[in-house]
Amino acid sequence: AKGNLVAVVSDGTAVLGLGDIGPEAAMPVMEGKALLFKEFADIDAFPICLDTKDTEEIIETVKRIAPVFGGINLEDISAPRCFEIERRLKEELDIPVFHDDQHGTAIVVAAGLINALKCVGKKMEEANIVINGAGSAGISICRLLLQFGVGNIVLVDQKGALCPGEAWMNDAQKEMAEKTNKDRQTGLLPEIIK
C-alpha cells in the first residue's frame, strides 16, 4: 500500500566510505537500506538509483515517481546539492521527504551529546563543540545542535574552520559560518582542537 511504501533514492555521489561511486555501484547500499526499513519498521522500501548528478533532473524524477510512494528517503547525495534537493522536494511534494545522511546522523550525534553532557555534568550552553566535516552531515549536525542551544560550535572542513568571509565556502557553509565560531578561529583541525 502507498502509505507503507518508501522510495530510497540516490545518485551514488556520496556513499559512506566510498564517495562518488555512481548509481550502479550504489545499488547494494540502497538495497541494504530498504532491508533495514522492512526489518526494523515493517515498511516496504524500493531502492532507486538515478543516473544523473543534475539537481533539476533529480528533483523532477522524484516528483514524477512520488505519487506511488508514501515517503521519500534521499540517500547518499553529495553536498551542497542535497540541501536544495531536499528543500525543494519538501516544498513541492505532499509526502514526507527525509535525507538520512543529514538528519539521521544529526539525531544520533545529538543523542550522544545529550548523554555525554549528563555524564560530565554540563549544560548544552556550556559545551564547546568542534565538528570535523562541513558537508551534509556536519551542516545538519550543526543546525540541530544550535537548536538545542549549544554554546559554541566550530565547523571545520578540509580547507579549515568555517569563518565569515571565506571565499571557498558554499551557501550552506556560509550560513553556518555566520551562526558559529564565535571567537572567529581560523586554521585546520589540529589548530582548532588544541
Task: Describe the residue ranges of each PLM region.
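Glycine-rich phosphate/diphosphate-binding loop of Rossmann-like nucleotide-binding domains
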Residues: 16, 21-41, 93, 99, ...
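N-terminal ligand-binding/catalytic initiation module
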Residues: 1-95
